[in-house]
């Protein structure tokens, strides 16, 4: 009995500590919940904008634009790179290449086996804002919601503290309560504060539980709630609200001539039905749209994000800052296992290549006209190169001293199909412990299985 009581006190202490850590990370989000400008673009200089939409699917873009001529016009000047591959089908491995380029692909991360994974992950997140503010000419920067920052489920933006020219925020869930106040007619859903309080408690259990039990406790983010409709809505709206308020979160008062923004949003990661044609949350869905994916909730939730993003782009145009803005819209991975463009065979049945087909849309300075498509072989690790091009020549990674470029792509992209997606899934703190035969080198046309060549990576055995 004494031992049981002692164990109980220890666990209670762990829960309190976990909850305290949750509050600390949440408090450092830098946002009070009040909707006001936090992103300050430049009216006269250059704006370089990275929009990271977690799990946004490349193959959905064209049907969305065909469905809405207005949306297509809002994305004027953009090029959709259809032949783009990602390096994994999960954020933990798939996000670092987006932020840090080819030095942070899974294979390259594993080569630096003397450094902890969390340290290399943080390097990737910090690389671009540091380059722009330290190697660029009169740049300030902002970053929001950087996925897995400091390997924390809620991004731990304390990693930005040493860099005063970089502002950092967590917008996820920050505006959820305000959104409900502004949209009281959305539905007869229970007030979100109870759900949030419940999840905060369960999150503390998650943080203090043995690693082997965390996946069970997390239960795909629902924490075993029986109110699945409300949980799905809150999960989606916690991110959607930031997209819906994006115009209100943006002004044009940059204190420096030039501005870099890295904005991450996770709304696409939750499949949820929205009301077409504008794809907005509604208590009753009477119109699912007329695209070929009309019944697909993943399509619907992404359409909601793209429509709000289109409204923001229109806002930039109205304020004269569209032409002086370079914008990249990219994701870490996709989610549909099987897509039409892929020529299906036994190899693709194992790989599920659609999961590695991220959105990659780019608009350069002064670009205009109808959206174009491009079939050049790309990876989402091309993001830093394309954003830095012509602005900071010979850019150098401030953490490694190596040049930032896309030369490693010349030999193809070394993709891992590993299904490990939480930090505790890896048996090493320094490398991704991927199965040796879970690697494929991808090149040229990603839709043909002959261009996915299996390789064995011995270092993954460490």
Regions found by a protein language model. Give the residues of each.
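Catalytic domains that recognize anionic headgroups
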Residues: 1-462
């Amino acid at each position: 009995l004494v031992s049981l009581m002692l164990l109980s006190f220890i666990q209670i202490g762990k829960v309190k500590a976990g909850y305290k850590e949750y509050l600390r990370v949440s408090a450092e989000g830098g946002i009070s919940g009040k909707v006001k400008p936090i992103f300050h673009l430049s009216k006269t200089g250059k704006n370089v904008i990275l929009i990271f939409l977690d799990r946004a699917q490349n193959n959905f873009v064209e049907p969305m634009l065909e469905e809405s001529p207005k949306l297509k016009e809002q994305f004027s000047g953009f090029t959709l790179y259809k032949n783009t591959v990602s390096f994994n089908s999960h954020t933990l491995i798939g996000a670092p290449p987006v932020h840090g380029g080819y030095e942070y692909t899974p294979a390259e991360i594993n080569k630096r086996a003397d450094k902890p994974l969390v340290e290399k992950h943080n390097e990737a997140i910090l690389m671009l804002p540091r380059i722009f503010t330290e190697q660029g000419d009169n740049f300030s920067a902002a970053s929001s919601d950087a996925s897995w920052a400091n390997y924390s489920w809620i991004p731990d933006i304390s990693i930005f503290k040493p860099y005063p020219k970089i502002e950092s925020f967590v917008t996820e869930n920050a505006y959820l309560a305000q959104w409900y106040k502004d949209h009281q007619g959305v539905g007869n859903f229970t007030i979100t504060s109870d759900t949030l309080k419940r999840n905060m408690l369960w999150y503390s259990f998650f943080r203090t539980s043995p690693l082997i039990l965390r996946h069970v406790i997390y239960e795909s983010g629902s924490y075993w709630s029986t109110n699945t409709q409300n949980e799905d809505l809150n999960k989606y709206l916690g991110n959607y609200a930031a997209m819906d308020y994006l115009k209100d979160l943006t002004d044009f008062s940059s204190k420096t001539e030039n501005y870099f923004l890295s904005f991450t949003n996770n709304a696409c990661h939750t499949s949820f039905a929205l009301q077409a044609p504008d794809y907005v949350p509604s208590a009753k869905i009477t119109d699912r749209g007329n695209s070929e994916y009309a019944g697909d909730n993943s399509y619907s939730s992404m359409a909601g994000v793209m429509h709000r993003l289109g409204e923001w782009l229109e806002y930039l145009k109205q304020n004269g800052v569209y032409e002086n803005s370079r914008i990249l819209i990219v994701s870490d991975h996709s989610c549909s296992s099987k897509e039409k463009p892929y020529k299906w065979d036994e190899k693709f049945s194992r790989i599920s290549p659609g999961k590695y087909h991220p959105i990659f849309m780019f608009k350069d300075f002064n670009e205009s006209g109808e959206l174009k498509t491009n079939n050049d072989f790309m990876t989402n690790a091309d993001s830093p190169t394309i954003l830095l091009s012509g602005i900071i020549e010979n850019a150098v990674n401030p953490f490694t001293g190596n040049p930032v470029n896309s030369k490693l792509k010349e030999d193809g992209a070394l993709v891992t199909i590993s299904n490990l997606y939480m930090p505790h899934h890896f048996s090493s703190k320094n490398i991704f412990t991927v199965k040796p035969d879970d690697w494929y080198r991808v090149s040229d046309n990603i839709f043909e299985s002959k261009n996915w060549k299996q390789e064995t990576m011995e270092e993954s055995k460490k």
